[in-house]
């Protein structure tokens, strides 16, 4: 999601990175760039049946499911293909990432994941479907998170969830911790009238984010996957956009540009 540049993807694949995809198109790019299928996860709330089939045919590591209906579809596709689908369930921990509300994904009001209070029931349901192999738990609480505390809270939540699931007889051995690690953007071009971003200090280094979450996660003995995404490529380029219009709606002034949230 953070980078679709095939030249950069090839370098990341050669360096041993994995890939998190949210569409068949992204999965195609990842495979074309040389990512090993056993290092690819498929996330997203709206996976089509044909996309699920494409993922299963390529034997990727895990499909991260987000609802009971999706579990049914994955199971039916796997049955049709004569396969057993490896899945993780994304759980919504209701944790405030303390980032921009448009890119917060771990609160109850967000569409992502299954509610924490329903997790055990849905994990048991997934385990009852003969063509699913439940291997892990997944969470992702937001993007551009600049504080360590939400990650510490998320790690404690996931470790507790794994413990509860194991006590219920579910052999969970994998945690996908998600990402959202904030980055300090570097302003390559200064513009009069716009504030210059400080050179450092506002965002902790990536190491501190990981160190905050790692101790409690390691105690589970699970394989651990992180999604550093934006933090890898954020300062590898600049976004050049043009002001199209300015407008006022009541007390607010808006500047309309030819770029969107997806470009950020």
Describe each region flagged by the PLM:
Residues 2-174, 183, 244, 256:
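Active-site-proximal beta-alpha core segment in soluble small-molecule metabolic enzymes
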